[in-house]
């Protein structure tokens, strides 16, 4: 159910994943406005929150009228949490999901899909954010080590991806959490142009001034590499399912939703890569 009423902005906002890639950026943007109380929640952050410990939910939700929901991999607690959030006074839900999630199967994104469904079925105003892969996957975690080693091997082929800056995603989330007019909307958040992963690797190599080779892997070879690196089987299978979604072209579309919300174009990968390369992160 969707409510499109006009009202004052929320007096309190709970940000799940408050120390994570998008969550911490959302917190920073909201706090910079100084117009609302922002509570970043995580297992070890300012506000304790653990999906596996329901006793942590209600204390975290206390005083929150808006919620930035970053779902767990396990979908089982999501519906009950959203029900409790509504009961505690949350009237605006912003769900972080993923581009193409509506095409995902059992192997990837079950938590995100459950969060989308729970939001739609709730009585709160809801907005879904479906971003592409973040620029920051190249410099903060997922693909940082391979880039430093000079070889990025993935099972994606030549299907393009319009990578998006997590800062743009956070800016959209902050706007949607605090402004009216977004209820019942699904925003697909992409960068301004699509690049293959090989093209992204070349862009980063050029910015860093060092060689980076892209190698196309079969899904089986990619899984074997992840397991050899110590990844748990479930995580390796989830990444494999994510790339299967990409290979099918379900996240290749460039959208204008960042511009629609923010009134400006999204960041481009190339100038971002030059700026990040100057920090020495890929040296």
Question: Which positions does each model-derived feature cover?
Answer:
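Oxidoreductase cofactor-interface core, primarily capturing Rossmann-like NAD(P)-dependent enzymes
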Residues: 2-36, 40-43, 52-55, 62-64, ...
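Structural motif detector for alpha-helix initiation sites
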Residues: 166, 197, 219, 268-269
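A hydrophobic C-terminal alpha-helical subdomain
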Residues: 2-4, 19, 220-283
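Cofactor-binding loops of NAD(P)H-dependent oxidoreductases
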Residues: 49-50, 217
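Conserved substrate/cofactor phosphate-moiety recognition/catalytic segment
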Residues: 46
């Amino acid at each position: 159910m969707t409510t499109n009423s006009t009202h004052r902005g929320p007096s309190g906002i709970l940000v799940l994943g408050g120390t994570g890639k998008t969550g911490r950026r959302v917190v920073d943007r909201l706090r910079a406005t100084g117009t609302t109380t922002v509570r970043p929640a995580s297992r070890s952050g300012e506000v304790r929150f653990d999906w596996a410990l329901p006793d942590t939910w209600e204390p975290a939700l206390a005083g929150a009228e808006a919620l930035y929901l970053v779902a767990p991999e396990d979908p089982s607690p999501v519906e009950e949490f959203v029900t409790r959030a509504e009961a505690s006074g949350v009237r605006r839900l912003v769900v972080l999901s993923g581009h193409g999630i509506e095409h995902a199967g059992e192997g990837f994104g079950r938590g995100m899909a459950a969060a989308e469904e729970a939001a739609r079925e709730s009585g709160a105003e809801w907005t879904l954010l479906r971003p592409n892969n973040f620029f920051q996957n190249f410099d903060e975690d997922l693909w940082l080590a391979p880039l430093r080693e000079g070889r990025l091997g993935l099972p994606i082929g030549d299907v393009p991806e319009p990578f998006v800056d997590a800062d743009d995603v956070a800016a959209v989330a902050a706007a949607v959490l605090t402004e009216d007019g977004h209820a019942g909307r699904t925003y697909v958040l992409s960068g301004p142009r699509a690049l293959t992963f090989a093209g992204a690797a070349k862009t980063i190599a050029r910015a860093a001034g060092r060689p980076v080779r892209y190698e196309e892997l079969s899904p089986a070879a990619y899984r074997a590499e992840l397991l050899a690196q110590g990844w748990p089987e479930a995580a390796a299978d989830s990444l494999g399912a994510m790339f299967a979604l990409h290979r099918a072209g379900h996240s290749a579309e460039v959208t204008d939703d960042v511009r629609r919300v923010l009134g400006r174009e999204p960041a481009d990968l190339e100038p971002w890569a030059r700026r990040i390369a100057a920090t020495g992160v890929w040296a």
